[in-house]
UniProtKB/Swiss-Prot annotation:
GO molecular function: structural constituent of ribosome
SUPFAM superfamilies referenced in this protein's UniProt entry, alphabetically: Ribosomal protein S2
One Pfam match: Ribosomal_S2
Protein name, entry field: Small ribosomal subunit protein uS2
Entry keywords, A to Z: Ribonucleoprotein, Ribosomal protein
Region spans: Disordered: 1-30, 293-317
Family as reported in the entry's similarity comment: Belongs to the universal ribosomal protein uS2 family.
InterPro entries: Ribosomal_uS2, Ribosomal_uS2_bac/mit/plastid, Ribosomal_uS2_flav_dom_sf
């Protein structure tokens, strides 16, 4: 009788173990949510590169082997992988170091708005107009300009009392210019830990200053970019306002959520990832829209992807 009970008990245990393994196997097969859907990457036009004649050969591993109408296409699978990697790096770093400082940089027209918006919501510094040479390498010069701005602010508060109308207008014009260039960095007393840049080519001086001072640089890499120019790059279209907005917002989400805030785009449903319309956005140009439709149709049939990626790059220890 005891033997029979033992056999029953063993059989029950074995059955339970098998059930547990089945549950574990089922759980392991569940698809993890992606940081952003591929559909949104396509909607934002992140895959558009430049003409083949303008490419940087160092970007080869981030591009589809095929080109469309003489233009390189950026591998959206690599974009997704490296975007999520950058998100995790920033999120974990800020979680461990809450006082980490950032500077968002994007002086081209397509980047200005999202650079400023995401910097403000994360309490970061930003430059969305002109990068003043020496911003990171010659702080004393910047401090002097900030002091001049503060003096003019004091005079403006008194409506430039003691000055003629013409002199007052000249001073107000100077003050407006200083605000435009310095508002995003006026409180920066020390070097930021990270620079997040929309276009390393356009803002090459900023990137060079950052790397010379040990500031880690994360940037968008278009097909004409040099991946060696930054510490970590995310291959994507840097000429589309939608593409820049999508990438910058997700990177800002990494900072915001690490500090207890809410994400706007990262790991959100497509219905919440609402990309603004830009009249200057090339993805709205009919010529590019035809290329986009063609690409979407072909990608569904299995466009070859680039498997070789560099995910072991360390941005920060």
């Amino acid at each position: 009788m005891e033997n029979e009970n033992l056999k029953v008990e063993q059989a029950t245990t074995a059955e339970n173990n098998m059930a547990e393994k089945a549950d574990d196997s089922k759980a392991s097969k569940e698809v993890k949510p992606t940081i952003v859907s591929r559909e949104k990457l396509l909607e934002a036009g992140t895959y558009f590169g430049h003409k083949k004649s303008m490419w940087n050969p160092k970007m080869k591993e981030f591009l589809y082997p095929q080109s469309k109408r003489g233009m390189h296409m950026i591998n959206t699978n690599v974009t997704l992988q490296r975007l999520e990697f950058a998100y995790n790096i920033l999120n974990k770093f800020v979680a461990k170091n809450p006082r980490t400082t950032f500077i968002f940089v994007g002086t081209k027209k397509q980047a200005k708005d999202t650079i400023k918006d995401n910097a403000l919501r994360t309490g970061s510094f930003y430059v969305s107009e002109r990068w003043l040479g020496g911003t990171l390498t010659n702080a004393s010069t910047i401090f002097k300009r900030v002091k001049v701005m503060e003096e003019l602010e004091a005079q403006a508060a008194k409506k430039f009392q003691g000055y003629t109308k013409k002199e007052g207008l000249i001073k107000q014009k100077e003050l407006d210019k200083l605000h435009k260039n310095l508002d995003g960095i006026r409180k920066m007393q020390s070097l930021p830990s990270f620079m997040i840049v929309a276009d390393p080519n356009v803002d090459a001086i900023a990137v060079k200053e950052a790397r010379s001072k040990g500031v880690k640089v994360i940037g968008i890499l278009d097909s004409n970019s040099n991946p060696d120019a930054v510490d970590f790059g995310i291959p994507a279209n840097d000429d589309s306002a939608k593409s820049i907005t999508l990438i910058m917002t997700i990177l800002a989400d990494a900072i915001a959520t690490a500090r207890g805030g809410k994400a706007k785009f990262a790991y959100q449903g497509d219905d919440k990832v609402i990309l603004p319309e830009f009249k200057t956005d090339k993805t709205l140009n009919p010529r590019f829209m035809n290329q986009r439709r063609s690409f979407e149709q072909n990608s569904a049939e299995g466009v070859k992807t680039v498997e070789k990626t560099t995910t072991s790059t360390e941005v920060a220890e």
